[in-house]
């Protein structure tokens, strides 16, 4: 039965929504989990709730707002840093990086999967078109899967079907799934939380790194597919 249940890290963005629709066609039961970590773009949680309702999938929010008190990121509400610069703790990373965020998310998803009797966790991470975050890479995902299973005596799989897809390929995947319109109009990616301006690729400020990646991907999708 556990092979038929999947727990998904769900932000309401392009990646995780495409993933949720993909998973709903492959698993008997899918559970969506969002995280409130005091992010500036908390509007994504509202989008996630609406999308979960549209997809008729159960959705839980886990509170992690303590993160802004123990580490640095320009994504936190208490930060006045402008997104687009180097991280104060590591100059090789963008300041939108939240240290250990994915490690925390995945650890909690792993615990929840055990409670549900699920043997699958699905993540919308990609190292093809990503924001320079090391915790989105395949080697990290494989390592934490191994570590958590060792620590829990489990065999839970972490599934990452978007790992080597570009944003353009993700738009094509959404089209193939019959969900392109939903991805464009309902998902949220913008770090600034902008939901007033609808571009061809979706809502957003059009300037932040997240919007730039999404815009570039959509333009490539239109040109290639």
Curated annotation (Swiss-Prot):
EC number from the UniProt entry: 6.3.4.20
Protein's UniProt name: 7-cyano-7-deazaguanine synthase
Record lineage: Bacteria, Pseudomonadati, Campylobacterota, Epsilonproteobacteria, Campylobacterales
Residue sites binding Zn(2+) per the record: 190, 205, 208, 211
Alphabetical list of Pfam families matching this protein: QueC
Cofactors: Zn(2+)
Catalyzed reaction equations: 7-carboxy-7-deazaguanine + NH4(+) + ATP = 7-cyano-7-deazaguanine + ADP + phosphate + H2O + H(+)
UniProt keywords, alphabetically: ATP-binding, Ligase, Metal-binding, Nucleotide-binding, Queuosine biosynthesis, Zinc
Protein family: Belongs to the QueC family.
Gene Ontology BP term (one): queuosine biosynthetic process
Binding-site positions, ATP: 10-20
Function recorded in the entry: Catalyzes the ATP-dependent conversion of 7-carboxy-7-deazaguanine (CDG) to 7-cyano-7-deazaguanine (preQ(0)).
Top-rank EC class of the record's enzyme: ligase
Pathway in which this enzyme or protein is active: Purine metabolism; 7-cyano-7-deazaguanine biosynthesis
One term of GO molecular function: ligase activity, forming carbon-nitrogen bonds
Cofactor binding note of this UniProt entry: Binds 1 zinc ion per subunit.
